[in-house]
Amino acid sequence: MVHEVVKNLLEAEYAPQRSEEWLRLRGNMLTASDAATALGTNPYEKPRDLILKKCGHKKFDGNQATFHGNKYEDEARDIFCAQYGEVAHEIGLRPHPDHPWLGGSPDGITESGKLLEIKCPLRREIKEEVPVYYMPQLQLLMEILNLEECYFIQYKPAEITWPGPVEFVVVHVLRDRQWFADSLPVLQAFWEKVLWHREHGCADIMPKTRVSKTVVALAEPPKKVCIIMDCDEEDC
């Protein structure tokens, strides 16, 4: 039996991933993956940098860590479904029903009504807990999708852990409605800053260009030398 909320999510239409429509929609939203930065709890990105990105001044095409994570995401999902007896589906970018400037793309939703969020860290140590900077993403996704539970999946394949064992950790997270009530005003204020800077420009938050100073070593002036010479009384 498919959960009623999941059934509605699966029947909805979504823009294809990476399509022009998907990029346009995403550019006009504060997404779940942006939430920690907007709230100031992401140690890897400053709020100012996210504003610049949303205004088109910064572009992120991925790095080694994100490419690695994308490479093993499907594998991690399959392992989870096999171990937990779940059936999972992927859906596209979903706006919040009441706040359409908020959106998110889950890594999966199960037919039993759980959100899946998958992380395949390249170097970070996996612990049996959710890193604080990922919790806003999970909570916002549960709000957007109207789901009450989430499985936070962390996976390191043999390619990374060899000669040690594969690492696969699943943390169960419950929806926290109070978190959303407390965070919504902060997220909205941040989004209003984005809209303001889109209209007025970003000159006031652009990183200052560092001017390198060239230090020229000047030659020291010649020292005055006093020479005392012996002389005869007739010469002095």
Predicted regions and their residues:
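Accessory terminal regions of nucleic-acid processing enzymes
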Residues: 1-236
